[in-house]
Amino acid sequence: MAATQKPAAPKKKSQGFQGVRHAIIIIIFAFAVGICFYLFFLGNPANFANGDPEGHPLNMLGTVYKGGWVVPIILGLLCTVIAMSVERIIAISACSGKGNVTKFTENIKKALKDGDIAKAEDLCNKQGGSVANVVLADLKSYREMESAPIKLKEKVAAIQNAHEEETALEMPTMTMNLPIIATIVTLGTLTALFGTVLGMIRSFAALAAGGGADSMALSTGISEALVNTASGIATSWVSVVAYNYFTNKIDKLTFAMDEIGYTIAHTYEDKHPEA
């Protein structure tokens, strides 16, 4: 007799944009944009006296170009943060679903209060996204527990477990690529410090040359140090704002999930008192 095969566990249904899973592609592209911006925009001959990038800068763009080879690295980090932020905005919007999450939460709680599980499921199907997926898993467990031959406490625990499992499946979609933004918060500052040190080394080398200071070399070194400091701090600033914004959005979504999950479990407990 042939052995019966167990059906495969259902995969999480993909709904909307799930995020870029190969972030290295974004990083490479961002650094390519940063390098091109440095070479062809900041390094445009029109930004320098006599059209010579080695000469004196005529404007701020030329001054930033004089920051040296650390500048395109910082620009690459900045472009990475911007690209990752756009990716997270799209992904987290998809996780939120089609409608307002707060209104969706209120409608689900009202449907549960009325004992209308079918309406709650219909609301989830219309909403879509991670929050709706978690609520659907809770409601499915709710229905299954109605005919399960186990004690009430075990049924409530099963509904809570279903909620935790589905939440664990959805969280990676929401938090994906956030560690990269968090890393750039530190990398931006450290790269700026590195560029600053290189600029100061160049300045002191100019001071030490022949016992006197070459004013051109000295100003170049100081300019390099300050440009790297400013651009690195700006990159870290953008990264901090982006990271905190997205973590706050995710916290609100997980709070909505937990609020509805708690309501479903306790609604079941209230409507199915143990004999």
Residue spans of the language-model regions?
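Hydrophobic alpha-helical signal-anchor/transmembrane segments
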Residues: 1-94, 245, 268-275
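Generic serine detector
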Residues: 14, 23, 85, 93-96, ...
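Helix-termination/interfacial motifs at the ends of transmembrane alpha-helices
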Residues: 16-17, 34-57, 63, 171-249
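Generic detector of short alpha-helix boundary/capping microenvironments
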Residues: 22, 55-56, 70, 103, ...
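Predominantly long cytosolic amphipathic alpha-helical stalk/bundle segments
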Residues: 84, 90-91, 96-191, 205, ...
